[in-house]
Structures are given as structure tokens and as C-alpha cells.
């Protein structure tokens, strides 16, 4: 996906100077995986994370969805949200664990964006490599491993999706 096609308020040349990575399953969507996300997506969005996504987009940050699902499964979400980039699983490269961190780092390098200016939102210990790649990690929910890192690193925290949304 072309990450420089939109004019952005944070850089007169139209290039983003910051990025925000959003884990999809269990973070942006209240459902833990896309197979559980039946029916209209609107009721499955996790409102605080969706608000953060729109806030980053308004600032002209590169908005990136990160998911263990494949591109076909993500199609309804990408249609609704129109992210600048999507990092998702391919048959030869699942997007899990360290793969999320590697993919985020590669995208930042490709776009010339400093990691210190970037954000990542994630909900589980397996996402720690993604959170470790940015200057502003945000823990969503109450995963004990992530909460320990959040306390040590003074990371922001957002509440977990409520049970009735899952």
C-alpha cells in the first residue's frame, strides 16, 4: 500500500513523521480473533482504541493495522478503516510474536520514520515485540506480562474490551 499518497498535516511534503500500529484481534476489535467477529463490525470495535486510531489519523500519522489473520479475512476491516498499511499473515510468514516486531521495524525503515515518534497498541504478551519497537507503547487490557512492562516503562494503558462486546 502506498504510504505517502495522502497529504498529511504533520509534514508539508505529505510524508508521515510518526506511525501508529494497531493490533487487530482483541485490541482494535473486541473479538479475540476474526473468526469470532460475526455480524456488523461496528458493534465489535473497542471504542477507546478506535478513538486512538482516528486521533492518529487526524494528526497525519501513518496508521498501520497488524494482524495474525490474512488479507482476505481483514478485507472488511480495511474497507471500514482505510489504514495506510496492513501487516498481516501470509502462508510463508505468519504475523505473530517476533514477526510483528520485525515487520514494524522494516516498515518504519522503509518510510524513514523514527521509532521514537511511533505508537503501538496491543493486548497480549505475544505482542511485546511490536510494543518494544516504538517509543510510545500502549497496553490494552490487563495481560499480566504487559502490565509488568508497562509499570517498568511507564507505558500508557487503555481498558480491556468489555465482556458483552466480545
Give the label of every model feature segment.
Residues 2-22, 41-166:
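C-terminal cap/substrate-recognition subdomain and adjoining C-terminal extension
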Residues 27-29:
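Hydrophobic "anchor" residues
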Amino acid at each position: 500500500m502506498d504510504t505517502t499518497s495522502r497529504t498529511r498535516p504533520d509534514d508539508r511534503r505529505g510524508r508521515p513523521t510518526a506511525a501508529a500500529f494497531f493490533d487487530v484481534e482483541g485490541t482494535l476489535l473486541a473479538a479475540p480473533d476474526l473468526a469470532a467477529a460475526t455480524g456488523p463490525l461496528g458493534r465489535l470495535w473497542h471504542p477507546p482504541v478506535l478513538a486512538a486510531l482516528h486521533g492518529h489519523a487526524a494528526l497525519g500519522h501513518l496508521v498501520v493495522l497488524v494482524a495474525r489473520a490474512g488479507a482476505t479475512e481483514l478485507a472488511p476491516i480495511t474497507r471500514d478503516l482505510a489504514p495506510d498499511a496492513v501487516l498481516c499473515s501470509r502462508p510463508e510468514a505468519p504475523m505473530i510474536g517476533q514477526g510483528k516486531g520485525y515487520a514494524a521495524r522494516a516498515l518504519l525503515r522503509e518510510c524513514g520514520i523514527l521509532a521514537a515518534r511511533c505508537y503501538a497498541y496491543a493486548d497480549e504478551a505475544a505482542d511485546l515485540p511490536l510494543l518494544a519497537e516504538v517509543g510510545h507503547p500502549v497496553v490494552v487490557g490487563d495481560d499480566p506480562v504487559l502490565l509488568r512492562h508497562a509499570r517498568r516503562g511507564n507505558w500508557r494503558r487503555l481498558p480491556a474490551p468489555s465482556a458483552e462486546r466480545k
